[in-house]
């Protein structure tokens, strides 16, 4: 069970009081959201019967809530064949806009290591100009932490903004659906 607080018209979810929290962002093949929702839900249900998959305000984008640790959920979900899931992004850290540089620095220090090479993918849905500002901020923090940004890296650092929520995670750059098709 989690608590919802409403403060000045903004809803805050207290994930600390509940083990269920956002662990994955899933993008779906165009016009296949219902099937994609069932696919990802069925895969994770085996490990977590409380898994919840929610549509976002954006076409073909889902948020997955689970009791599982983010790395376990990502591992379970990533190594499956899918017909309708396009990509799976782990959520290691969450925040809200505007992004606090101290939060971002702490998050990036926890999920990366000095000497690591990452491909940086920043996507802001529903907020103009935010992605370029966040991109610059993340690049500067990564530089301070001794992490190289390389477009050829197979490890991606994802920073996803959905409305006013910011999700940060590290995972494979390989899209799940496309990987399954090309590997067969």
Predicted regions and their residues:
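SAM-dependent transferase fold signal centered on methyltransferase-like domains
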Residues: 2-184
